[in-house]
Amino acid sequence: YAFEMYSLAANAGDSYSMNRLALMYDRGEHVEQDFYEAFDWYMKAAEAGLPAAMSNVASMYRHGEGVNQDYDEAMTWFRKAAYEGYSYALYAIGELYLGGYGVAEDSTEAAAWYQRASDAGEPNGHWSLALRYLYGDGVAMDTRKAGDLAYLALVNGLDLALEEFKEISTADTSPNFRRRIQELLKQDGFYRGSVDGSFGPQTMRAVEAAFGSAL
């Protein structure tokens, strides 16, 4: 029923419905997966001025789904979406610079875009910028700031942040970073243990309790 409803509205020219219909084709929800149909509907919605669709067009170009892979087109459409204030696109531009996709690899430029995304409240931006500060890649190393940003991503419900935190207990990360996370968990009432940088079961339970708590 949802598919028919969005299909009718999309064909009547509603840009939001065009993007929803494209998502259904993209993910194979209520209809057989079809990247080509998805791309066509994303493009129609993007040309109708919908920022989320502009970002989706860019993603299709980046991954070569439903269209030939083209990093220049990906950058163009991510920039259009970013210009319209779509925060995910700010993060995605950072990803293109970090990986050198269609541009010269530039971790400083990547960090600047992650910062813009983070400032706009994008959880992916918080997390990616946290990693730059944690390892001093593209910015001066600042493990405390890395902790603040990683925590922001966690409480804003970024699945990737929760998955990565589960690895942190064994990963070779800065003790200062881990202590900062514990301080923040304690401040928000999720953690009652000692701030020792050791990510044991008690800290991990606190991390899971904090996940998505700002939403």
Predicted region positions:
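Short acidic, glycine/serine/threonine-rich helix-capping segments at coil-helix boundaries
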Residues: 175-176, 186-215
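TPR/TPR-like (Sel1-like) alpha-helical repeat modules
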Residues: 112, 127, 131-134, 140-160
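Hydrophobic face of amphipathic alpha-helices that form TPR/SEL1-like repeat modules
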Residues: 20-27, 31, 54-63, 90-99, ...
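Short coil/turn and helix-start
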Residues: 11, 27-33, 47, 65-69, ...
